[in-house]
Amino acid sequence: MKQDSRNLYLAIGLSLLVLIGWNYFFAGPQVEKARQAQIVREQQAQTQTTSDTTARSDLNVPGQRSLPGESPQTQLSRPEALAASPRVKLDTPNLFGSINLRGARIDDVSLKAYRETVAKDSPNIVLLSPSGTPAPYYADAGFVAPAEAGLLLPKSDTLWSADREVLTPEAPVTLTYDNGQGLIFHRTISVDDRFMFTLTDKVENKTDKPVTLYPYSLVSRHGRPVTAGYAVLHEGMVGVIGDNGLQEITYDKIHKEENATKSFKGTGGWLGFTDKYWAAVIAPDQATPFEGRFSERGTTTPLYQTDALGPALTIAPGGTGGDMSRLFAGAKETQTLDDYRNELGIKKFDLLIDWGYFYFITRPMFWILHTIYQVVGNFGVAILCITVLVKAVFFPLANRSYLSMAKMKAIQPQMLALRERYADDKVKQQQELMELYKREKINPVAGCLPMLIQIPVFFALYKVLFVTIEMRQAPFFGWIRDLSAPDPTNIFNLFGLLPFDPTHLPMIGHFLAIGIWPLIMGVSMFFQMKMNPEPADPVQKQMFSWMPVIFTFMLGTFPSGLVIYWTWNNTLSVLQQSLIMKRAGVKVELWDNLMSTFRKKAVT
């Protein structure tokens, strides 16, 4: 097999890998995202007939399969729904919103530090919304009991009283409800200065009989959420329950489950919902066993729910009993999740971020990138620095590869002579070439090793850029204001001079996301390939000539931070190869190859 053929096959393989990855991670998910948007539009166009039923209605309590739910509600705007019930204001350094006194729900949470877009007047991210709105999403907790007990327990329409009007990190709020039958319920809600609520429930039994209750906590989400739709990212139900490992259940998957329910038992853990950057999850007492459940109900408008049911709590006459649970509602900041795991002992809470199967590569990559960022103050510059660091780490292997390539160039006359001598005997020609490689101690495929080496780093960095909120809306310089998003410029509308967005064109829009940085990347790849002489075979020559163009179109939809990494890596590779070739006494043919290419273009 010819050396050029080996390189061609490797190049084709790498190109196919990227093409498949592009289709899997980008083209397919865009179609899925459009499908999800259509589902949501259909849901919103229908009358909301699904009951606002929570865990109170069907938690598996001994002796009871169903508790009364709520009546259907008319869909309201978010401001109307918030004004319909008395509330306790929520105000922390990172959150604002309110606690609903009707039902004692946490159903109004927005994030102070995060906005929908990079525009200064962009709305804050709204995480939780009350029942009755187009997309209810809320957390709840309390107690259930067997139906035969005949106990009057707080429901979603129960009106609680509060001892203060504003909940802050310095001032917890205590809610109280007296059922008029000898049971008094107290719920103290505290919140830290980040995203964690602590719910401490206490029940006073003033009757003359013991009372048995089962504590629960839940997060409920009505309607099918629109997800980012990327296979590289999990969005949906998620949790760690005891020793059952990380559970990631998509909305499609739970719909296909028998009875649309999955349950697990264990001690310690958490469960809830995760989006790309945000999450709402409950964490029961880490020392108490519980049953965690993921479920879907409803037909017209699905209701997704994650809930935790604790063991029986028996309260003696005149006694007091209680339960504690936590609610995380906020941004999936890496350090914040690590702190909650370490300080609160929440089991594997850092897995709320989808680091993927290559956690052992992706997580260290983020740590290095974030450490550099803390020094340089810009994630784009940190990406440039980590590229240099990776080059330094793999320099010995890359050095051997480039030296092998330099030797290949040095023996080009001998290779050409052998091919001419044995032009009619391909087997003999190949044998003589392999003998020449062996005699000169050359690895004929070593030239592709640098590209193979950077593939794991490429995908690890891609994962970091895509899933970590620290990269969201992180600027670089100039027009790059979000390293986690594609380059906003586009050559097909003359970089904004023409009033249309080519990426919105049906069928071909995904291929037209060619901005300035993808173009620079294509040029850098073109220069890198011109470091080597053109293959003699016309087919191989055309293949290598088109590779920079193909990669430019494919990487156009990738996060701009990744394109910047690839561009800088190509540039460093050209410089590194030039230095190594000069040290080996081999002429650097970049300029000659470029001039040869342009002269041929001019002649044609």
Swiss-Prot record:
GO MF term list: membrane insertase activity
Keyword Metal-binding in annotation: no
Subcellular localization, as worded in the UniProt entry: Cell inner membrane
Biased composition (Low complexity): 43-58
Region (Disordered): 42-84
Keywords: Cell inner membrane, Cell membrane, Chaperone, Membrane, Protein transport, Transmembrane, Transmembrane helix, Transport
Record's bilayer topology term: Multi-pass membrane protein
Pfam families for this protein: 60KD_IMP, YidC_periplas
Subunit (UniProt): Interacts with the Sec translocase complex via SecD. Specifically interacts with transmembrane segments of nascent integral membrane proteins during membrane integration.
Family classification: Belongs to the OXA1/ALB3/YidC family. Type 1 subfamily.
Listed name of the protein: Membrane protein insertase YidC
